[in-house]
Amino acid sequence: DFLDQAIPLIVGSHQNAQSYQILDNALVIKLDNGDSTGLAESASFIGFNGEAAKPSELVFKHNDLHFIVQFDASNPIAQSDMAGISDIAMESALTTIMDCEDSVAAVDAEDKIIAYQNWLGLNQGTLSETFEKSGKQQTRLMHQDKNYQKLDGTAGKLKGRSLMFVRNVGHLMTNNAILDQHNNEVPEGIMDAVITSLISTYDVNQHNTLRNSDTGSVYIVKPKMHGPEEVAFANELFDRVEELLSLPRNTLKMGIMDEERRTSVNLKACIYAAKERVVFINTGFLDRTGDEIHTSMSAGVMARKADIKLTKWISAYEDNNVDIGLACGFSGKAQIGK
């Protein structure tokens, strides 16, 4: 059903396909009734691997996302499929957030060092993890880029990984990983900005084999900001970090979490405060409701979590985030996370 919806045939259905091959730079599908057909939109087929008469992979583009139809005769799934299809690999998450935040990833200096080490491994392309499953040792590595042959005979390549963002902490937190001359913990958001950006120079300066950004950018999500003044502070912090690391202005891109009341009601002003950097906005149910609880705590008993999700104000909050993002020109240029 998916193939019939994403890449429909001129006639017939992919369910009745017996074979796929490339003839004269076009995909030809032979059906079980002996007829041959092609794609209703031929431009959706962009390349392949293997032999033209018997490809091992077919690469398609649909709604600006890619997917690969794979053929492997040794696979049990392929052996039960008339055309020998073994799997379909989908390009799904466009972006992935690596988290340095206190609530989920790092609560002290030791945790923070681990988070930085993982971010370093991701930017160097060397991160791996070995674990035991079903009595066997298994190792997970970062996915390599996917190479394929374009229809004109030239080489094509698809990213094997989604675009990585790194979430720093908000402005309030401090951390004992670094102490100042008076033995005070340093502001954790400043520490995160400097160290995660420094680590990201492996990618910016192309000192790695698995590239994250194709444009030499670093993508940082800033959470828990209360209004445009705090966004402006983050923007100035990014200016200072770029100067410290000798990075071109606006190398550090900003994702703004719309999860505090003053940000929600001033979202346009928040976006304006980082207008040269902003690449992402998103909502956050727990932080946003938490701010509402702290703001209105004396007004009476709050609704329970499950009931809050059904309230009109939560729907209005989510809708407003999308509406403001679109009104500010995000379509086709920046991400509205949902």
Q: What positions do the PLM features span?
A:
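Aromatic-lined carbohydrate-recognition surfaces of secreted/lumenal glycan-active proteins
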Residues: 252-258
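Short, internal active-site loops enriched in acidic
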Residues: 223-227, 258-263
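Catalytic alpha/beta active-site cores
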Residues: 1-233, 240-247, 253
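Active-site capping/gating regions of soluble enzymes
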Residues: 238-249, 261-338
